[in-house]
Every structure is written in C-alpha cells, then in structure tokens.
Amino acid sequence: MESISMMGSPKSLETFLPNGINGIKDARQVTVGVIGSGDFAKSLTIRLIRCGYHVVIGSRNPKFASEFFPHVVDVTHHEDALTKTNIIFVAIHREHYTSLWDLRHLLVGKILIDVSNNMRVNQYPESNAEYLASLFPDSLIVKGFNVISAWALQLGPKDASRQVYICSNNIQARQQVIELARQLNFIPVDLGSLSSAKEIENLPLRLFTLWRGPVVVAISLATFFFLYSFVRDVIHPYARNQQSDFYKIPIEIVNKTLPIVAITLLSLVYLAGLLAAAYQLYYGTKYRRFPPWLDTWLQCRKQLGLLSFFFAVVHVAYSLCLPMRRSERYLFLNMAYQQVHANIENAWNEEEVWRIEMYISFGIMSLGLLSLLAVTSIPSVSNALNWREFSFIQSTLGYVALLITTFHVLIYGWKRAFAEEYYRFYTPPNFVLALVLPSIVILGKMILLLPCISRKLKRIKKGWEKSQFLDEGMGGAVPHLSPERVTVM
C-alpha cells in the first residue's frame, strides 16, 4: 500500500495513508523505544538513528548497557523507557516477556512490535506474538522485523532482503508499523491478522525446504550413473583384459555422470507439467486438486532446473580440462606414433569432423539457453517480466533447450548406439540411458500440441468441465464449486 506524503510545504511533516489514518510523522519528531540490549537491539537502534529517529533503550542494567550504544541514545530502565514512547520494539526472548508484567499499566494502548524468533519450527502451540498479546491484552501487538538479521540491519537493506512481513489484529497499529518499515527503507508485506504470526516466525527457521527433494533426486541420480559408468568403463576392461583404467575415476567418469544428471533433471522439470496436463485431460477439469506428490513436484521445478544448470556448468568446466590431463597427452603421443608407424599421411575423417563440430555447437547453444532460464528465475529479473514473457522463456525456450540438449546427446552417441562393443556387460551405453526421459518428454509435448488435444486443454484451463458439458447436454444444473478447490496449473 502506497502512502501519500505532504511534501508541498516545508511545514507539512505528516504522512497520510490511503485509508485516511495518520501515519508516522517526521522521523526527527518520533521517539521509538527498544526493550532489550542484545545484538538485534543494537543493530536496530543504529538503523533507527541513521533514519533520523530518536531511540530510547529499556534495559535491566542501563549503566552497563549504555557502553554499547551511541551517546545519542537514551539508555534507561524499563519503566522510564515505556513512558517516553508509544511505539516499542520488544527485542527480548519469549521467556522474558513476563519481566514486563508489573509494568503492564504503562503499556495500555501502546504498540508493541514483537521481533522474536524460536529455536525450532512450531516450538510452541501459539506464536510468540499471540503469547505476548495474551499477557498484555490492552496493548496493540504487531509482529514484524523478525526475518531481518542484525547484520542486515547494520549494513542496510541494499545488502540483504528488503522484505519485512508484518501482521496485527489492529489495522491502525499495523499501518503505522508498515510506514515505519518504509521509513527504514524496507519493503513491508502486510499479512493481515496476528494469526499469521506463527508462519512469519517459522520463515527464518526453514532450511531450503523446497530444495530437499530435488537435491536428494540429484544426488541419487549422480550416484547411480557414476556407479553405472564405473562398472562399464573401469571394471569391465579390468575384468576382461586386466587393463587398469582406475585413473579415469576423478575426471572422465565424473564428466560422464554430470551431463546425464543435467539432462535428466531438465526433463523432470517439464515432465511434471505434462503429467499435470494429462491429469486435467483425464478428469476433464482444472478444479480437481493434483495428488500431493504431483503438487510437490510442480512446486520444485525451479529447484530442479537450477540443479540441472549447475550440473551442466560443471560438465563444461570438466570438459575444458580434459586436454590438460597428463593421460590425454600420453594418448595423443601414442596415436601420433601409431599413425607414423602405419605410414598414414592424412588421418582426416570428414564424418568425425562434422560430428564433433555439431556436437560442440549444440552443447554451447544448450548452455546458453539454460543460462537464460537460470537468470530469469532470479526474483528481481522475473518481477521485471510480465506473465507472457516469463511463460515464453520458461516454457517455450525451455522445451527448445531440452530439444537442443537431446540433439547434443544424439550427436555424441552417433553410430555407437548400434555397435556391439559398446554394450559392455550387456548394458546400454550411458548416452542411451540419458536419452530415454528427454525423448518421452518431447514426445509427450508433441502429443499435447496436436490440435484435437491442445484445444481441449485450453478449454479446460478457461474453466470448461467434462461434467458441465454432460450436465448441459442433459439439461441439468452445474453444481457450485468452491474457489478453494481451484488448482491453477
């Protein structure tokens, strides 16, 4: 929500919100209280002073605490601090809330901003802010600023996330704290009533929630394909010819694993969308919820795509290092000696030359498109695009990237997919396995692009239902569907 500032006259120092509520006045005339003298309280005080506020600190030991604050800060006892301001940051832990119980008569009608966090997710039945509200029912409790670290407060919002989540049961208090966040150069996000406080308190405690599944999938795929390549390229020569190729493990085997994992993860990104489309076509509606596993899969597509990009970049780095290996130099010298010994003047192979040229070219194009997909997934970049632009890049160009990557693998395999010597231990080559999932995804996309299917899918996305068509044909009424059941693809 934007505020309207009276900047026409130097005497107009008040800020008015669109709903007519008086916002915070000029920062130089506002005193803000902070209860607590810890690291967060110190950083918050410095931030408030830089933005022109006068700060009063309430501490149990003001004489000792004053040594850690600037001299312009008024460090005093809790009781004295509470009488000097109407906006108070409660920068103490939950277990110390009761220390303010005897001073509750001084907190009547005042705004208490709870900035505390817990040690683990859902540690208590109710949020800290709701617990604070139960202790001081006559105060206006606001939850906010808990997602900002003390380090970010000191450095300023340019070096950290600028979003601050704020909620309160009192609209007027919430709007004042929102305006305060704007004055501190943060971006406030209004989450409504105090019932959202528990979700806000859980946000800083979550560790890559959406990344766990994709990372497990990536590690599992990497482990499987690494062992698969190890058995085929190291164990097989040793078992058959007593040839020791264990030197290939650090570079060559790893480099064979990386591209397979990259293209498989990229295929999983778009396979989820195909399954979702097939699900909607099967049931003839978009109002039926996806199964939990598919819903989770759809939410993790960004993480799968970024992991695919990571494996592709590492694959390029490994490939560039291949000629630098000592083993590669020895192999090159051996090939040169054998050519001289066989009296071969020209070893030019037109087919191999074209194959490698196209192979590298398609690889570069694939990496370029993956880089574009990765860059547009950055929030600041995606926010600058409208929905059609973002969808075109992530969907249309994404499928183009998958198609070019598939060509890259096909050209790498070339005729070797039909050569018997490449089926060691009766297992197909690595590149054959890498082509299975991308081929399924590309074939599935081609089926969805057929006019008879794409038209039906577009109608479903616009709200058409199979049951509605049947009911209309029979002259029946369509039952009302709650908007809560709507699942957008």
From Swiss-Prot:
Q: Membrane topology for this entry? A: Multi-pass membrane protein
State the EC number(s).
Answer: 1.16.1.-
Localisation per UniProt entry = Cell membrane; Endosome membrane
Entry keyword set: Cell membrane, Copper, Electron transport, Endosome, FAD, Flavoprotein, Heme, Ion transport, Iron, Iron transport, Membrane, Metal-binding, NAD, NADP, Oxidoreductase, Phosphoprotein, Transmembrane, Transmembrane helix, Transport
Provide the binding site for FAD. W151, D159, Q280, R301, S377, Q394
Question: What does the entry list as the binding residues for NADP(+)?
Answer: 37-40, 59-60, 92-99, 117, 150
Amino-acid positions noted as binding heme b in the UniProt annotation, renumbered to this chain: H315, H408
Among the GO biological process terms of this entry, one is:
copper ion import across plasma membrane
| Reactions listed under catalytic activity | 2 Fe(2+) + NADP(+) + H(+) = 2 Fe(3+) + NADPH; 2 Cu(+) + NADP(+) + H(+) = 2 Cu(2+) + NADPH
Main location per UniProt? membrane
Q: Ferric oxidoreductase domain: which residues?
A: 258-406
Disulfides per UniProt: none
Q: Which residues carry this modification: Phosphoserine?
A: S482
Where is Fe(3+) bound in this sequence? Y228, Y318
For this protein, the parts annotated as crossing the membrane are: 207-227, 258-278, 304-324, 358-378, 392-412, 431-451
Q: Its domain of life?
A: Eukaryota
InterPro entries the UniProt entry points to: Fe3_Rdtase_TM_dom, NAD(P)-bd_dom_sf, P5C_Rdtase_cat_N, STEAP_metalloreductase
Cofactor section: FAD; heme b
Molecular-function annotations in GO: cupric reductase (NADH) activity; ferric-chelate reductase (NADPH) activity; metal ion binding
Pfam families cross-referenced by the UniProt entry: F420_oxidored (PF03807), Ferric_reduct (PF01794)
The UniProt family comment states:
Belongs to the STEAP family.
> Its biological function?
Integral membrane protein that functions as a NADPH-dependent ferric-chelate reductase, using NADPH from one side of the membrane to reduce a Fe(3+) chelate that is bound on the other side of the membrane. Mediates sequential transmembrane electron transfer from NADPH to FAD and onto heme, and finally to the Fe(3+) chelate. Can also reduce Cu(2+) to Cu(1+).
Name of protein: Metalloreductase STEAP2
